[in-house]
């Protein structure tokens, strides 16, 4: 309501034990400005965004958050208008001039309000094709058919890779055609996710395992 009704006022971070930092500038300058080296956390997400279809302003910087959900997103959502109109029916307003905002609201609506788990949400926003569903076991196929019919307006189309942060974990997801790259790596009890492997190796050069998830395949990592 603040974002929608009070001109010039925005809430960018409102979670418990979670913080969101937004800015326009070079990553090293942003980190120094917010003194990020003084913070500790079990999960960190970040995105250096170069806006191509929307205004470049600090409100459009990632992550986007609502309560304890945060989203960073690389790509372009061609289904944005359909997704936005559906979410507006349930009181969500997109005010920050970028398509990523609606993804955050979709997760809040499906997980917190509809009580769906993250794997089910992944099968809604990156739904399998009908031809794939037809080849599945009857019980699973019936469930996915229901999701595709009930939440058809929440299918996200276009190239994307996203990372969801939430209390106790993170989830990474590609579009179902894998039109955007995404790489996952592990070393001991640490998991790294990035658009490119070189970004991971810049932080941890000697990772033990590296792989690229399939399109529409969620990677869910939670605290022990």
For the regions a language model picked out, list residue spans one by one.
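Conserved short alpha-helical segments that host acidic/polar catalytic motifs at enzyme active sites
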Residues: 1-224
């Amino acid at each position: 309501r603040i974002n929608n009704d009070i001109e010039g006022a925005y809430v960018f971070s409102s979670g418990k034990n979670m913080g969101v930092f937004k800015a326009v500038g070079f990553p090293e300058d942003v980190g120094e400005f917010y003194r990020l080296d003084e913070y500790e956390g079990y999960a960190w997400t970040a995105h250096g965004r170069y806006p191509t279809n929307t205004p470049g302003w600090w409100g459009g910087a990632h992550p986007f958050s609502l309560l304890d959900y945060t989203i960073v997103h690389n790509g372009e959502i061609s289904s944005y208008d359909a997704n936005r109109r559906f979410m507006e029916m349930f009181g969500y307003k997109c005010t920050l001039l970028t398509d990523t905002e609606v993804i955050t609201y979709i997760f809040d609506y499906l997980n917190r309000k509809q009580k769906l788990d993250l794997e089910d949400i992944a099968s809604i926003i990156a739904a399998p094709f009908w031809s794939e569903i037809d080849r599945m076991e009857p019980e699973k196929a019936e469930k996915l058919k229901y999701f595709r019919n009930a939440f058809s307006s929440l299918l996200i189309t276009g190239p994307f890779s996203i990372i969801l942060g939430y209390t106790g974990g993170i989830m990474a997801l590609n579009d179902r055609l894998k039109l955007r790259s995404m790489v996952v790596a592990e070393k001991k009890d640490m998991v790294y996710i990035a658009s490119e492997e070189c970004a991971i190796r810049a932080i941890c050069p000697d990772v033990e395992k590296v792989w690229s998830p399939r399109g529409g395949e969620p990677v869910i990592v939670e605290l022990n």
